[in-house]
């Protein structure tokens, strides 16, 4: 790799990191790939390809994973309904939220909310977060869900 191509690769990685940081910060806001790409002055197609190559998933998939992780935390608290959690994490469709949640976690959000309260009772929040962290896309076990 030549010096100029290595420098370009570092610039591209820094750009992708800015996109990922923005998703982490603004997950609850309406975000789409086009807006993220405009923010770093590249095309949406280029951003999607480069992001997938660097992080192993598309920007949209990464965004939804962050939203579902936050939703899991809110559902474990138990003081919000599934609909309130859906909108609190930036999803505008309860159906899409429930489908994606089920894909990542292996059970519907309403079931998770009920079981999480029972399964994490008495466990410190920092440990519960690690134990109940979602798996990546479409890797949820097909069998019975287990929270611990």
Indicate residue ranges for each PLM-predicted region.
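Alpha-helical bundle regulatory/interaction domains
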Residues: 1-46, 53-54, 58, 70-148
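Short, basic-rich loop-to-helix N-cap that marks the start of a DNA-contacting helix
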Residues: 61-63
